[in-house]
Amino acid sequence: IKGVGYSATNSELGKSVPIITLNDILKISKLDDRILKFDCEGCEYETILSAPKEILQKFNQIIIAYHYGHKNLVEKLKHSGFEVSYMKPRYFPRVFYNDFTEESKMFIGHIHANKII
């Protein structure tokens, strides 16, 4: 799957797991107060950046562990109606890279977004 990460697409080790979309999560969840937490080693970029505002707005909070910088994720969340705070990035050596990342170096941290009502 494009954008999921090097280790998920190029490894013969490990175990296959089903992949679900944000739409699938929303269909499963019957709750009104939804929180989305991401720590998926790089897939957060393609998932968040390609998600329509209407889908993101179904979550009251979005918490993301980012791996390659935060700027494009923060911008997308702000434009989707969220108040956003984030942890200052820490540098780590490059592990893998995908098309949705800002850089090939790992700058990790956390983003917390609250939907503006």
Please annotate each region the language model reported.
Residues I1-I117:
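Phosphate/nucleotide-binding beta-alpha loop and adjacent structural elements of enzyme active sites
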